[in-house]
């Protein structure tokens, strides 16, 4: 969705970050990147929204990249371990591609017993963060997953060509790694 917005003559890119249950994700650092350099950034507010002011430089390509690296244990509990184990045993399969992403604690694009071990180490305090993954992953809301039972690889950034107009609807789904029951 694009459209002109009156923001003091500035061009802005804006969107929101929600969980797959439509809860807003606050405190996500959203960066505007050009040629591997951060041009500007902001943290999402309590409703999960962000607005980035874009430099008036025609022809530039920009990347919008969300990151949240804090509170790795938030929302992660033994209930998540039980849920992943039931999935692995075929007793209660995941019903969302985002649960697969959340369960992939070691970031190897599959869900296995190794992920259970990694999540258990986080719960027990052996880890303060996942060694091979970030505490939150973000998926472009408009990304069409070819196989919801194997959602990898997925678009975790949005790339745009600057056209001199404001763009809204640059939305992401936030996935808390380890939190398959979405309690964070």
Label every PLM stretch briefly:
Residues 2-184:
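Cellulosome-associated attachment modules in secreted, modular CAZymes
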